[in-house]
Curated annotation (Swiss-Prot):
Keywords: Cytoplasm
Listed InterPro entries: ADP-ribosylarg_hydro, ADP-ribosylglycohydrolase, Ribosyl_crysJ1, Ribosyl_crysJ1_sf
Phenotype upon loss of function: Morpholino knockdown results in defective embryonic cardiogenesis with hearts forming small ventricles that do not beat. Defective endocardial maturation with endocardial cells showing a rounded morphology and no clear lumen forming in the heart. Myofibril assembly is disrupted in the developing ventricle, preventing ventricle outgrowth.
Gene Ontology biological process: cardiac chamber ballooning; cardiac myofibril assembly; protein de-ADP-ribosylation
GO terms under cellular component: sarcomere
Protein name: Inactive ADP-ribosyltransferase arh2
Length: 354
């Protein structure tokens, strides 16, 4: 249970660190961010509180997903209706947090008063952003057992489509949910990427059954898959017998920014649903259990550090717990009790199931 609590809490910590009250989100240089961090006294001397280090809409939407998952819904459709209401409620309260525009636009299409079609939204050409991925980690925590795989796939896709109805967006949601389930199942880290790719045909079959006009999704579907295949080949972990990721000899903040740009679709690492989980995953592969190194790789770079940080923080919590993380980074964190409470509830619900 402690790791579930750590996962929810460190997702918030990673978000707050990478976001830095919006000031680091638009900084395109990881080197500059790390210089500023030194001037602040270094990671271990930061005190994250609501005043200078609030969480962003990533954490608020993740909380909304988790609260739906621990509610007393009586069917999957009922769960979706609850998610719709909670997402709209969050968006209504986002003044001052400068939310992801795709999330705002996606929520505008939700219909909370329409019992049958509440969560059905149209295909959105602009819905490829990271916001679906950063609110879905808890789905993999709720349905982590192998016997719940179909539910995990369905719920992560539908939750993603509510706000980001574009394959690059909602497959990011599937990806982060799968990764959290793999962390709890203790699958070797180097296998996660290829295990996820193996399940994309299953996800596609589900979408073909539930999406009327699948044709407009198809070309974007292959983009997500191709980007991940390219990444796994670059790290030399694409094949079954490849379990030792290969990193460049020089992979400092400047080189990482360059790499993250090549994986992106618009020159800013972590802005989309494919590369936000990718950067978090790459950071975990490179950092292992070293929290400070994870932060350097996933939170402090010239891309969307709040998004990649929240995913990486959550996965780190499930893999390693919270003991190596400085207490000043979470003791005064905004919504700390709420996050820990949700971690506890997710644990109890997931373990109660046979």
């Amino acid at each position: 249970m402690e790791k579930f609590k750590a996962a929810m809490l460190l997702a918030g910590t990673g978000d707050a660190l990478g976001y830095k009250n919006f000031s680091w989100v638009f900084c395109a240089s990881g080197v500059k961010i790390q210089e500023e961090l030194k001037q602040l006294g270094g990671l271990e001397n930061l005190v994250l509180s609501i005043d200078g280090w609030p969480v962003s809409n990533n954490t608020l939407m993740h909380i909304a997903t988790a609260e739906s998952l621990v509610s007393d819904y009586w069917s999957i459709e009922d769960l979706y209706r609850d998610m719709v209401k909670r997402y709209i409620d969050v968006v209504d309260k986002l003044q001052g947090r400068r939310p992801d525009p795709a999330t705002i636009e996606g929520c505008a299409h939700l219909k909370p008063d329409n019992y049958l079609l509440a969560w059905h939204t149209p295909f959105n050409e602009k819905g490829s952003g990271f916001g679906a991925a950063t609110k879905a980690m808890c789905i993999g925590m709720r349905y982590w057992k192998p016997g719940r795989l179909e539910t995990l796939i369905e719920v992560s896709i539908e939750s993603g489509r509510m706000t980001h109805n574009h394959p690059t967006g909602f497959l990011g949601s599937l990806c982060t949910a799968l990764f959290t389930s793999y962390a709890i199942q203790e699958k070797p880290l180097a296998q996660w990427g290829r295990e996820m790719l193996k399940l994309l045909p299953m996800a596609e079959e589900y979408c073909k059954k539930t999406i009327r006009h699948m044709a407009e999704y198809q070309e974007h579907w292959f983009y997500f898959e191709a980007k991940w295949q390219f990444y796994l080949e670059e790290r030399e972990i694409a094949e079954e017998n490849e379990n030792k990721p290969k990193f460049p000899d020089k992979y400092d903040a400047e080189e990482r920014d360059k790499a993250y740009k090549t994986w992106s679709s618009e020159g800013r690492g972590g802005r989309r649903g494919h590369d936000a989980p990718m950067i978090a995953y790459d950071a975990l592969l490179g950092a292992g259990g070293d929290w400070k190194e994870l932060c350097n790789r996933a939170m402090f770079h010239g891309g969307e550090g709040g998004a990649t940080g929240s995913i990486a923080g959550c996965l780190y919590g499930l893999l390693y717990g919270i003991s190596k993380v400085p207490k000043s980074l979470y003791q005064q964190l905004e919504m700390k009790e709420r996050l820990e409470n949700l971690g506890e509830k997710l644990y109890h619900l997931a373990t109660m199931e046979k």
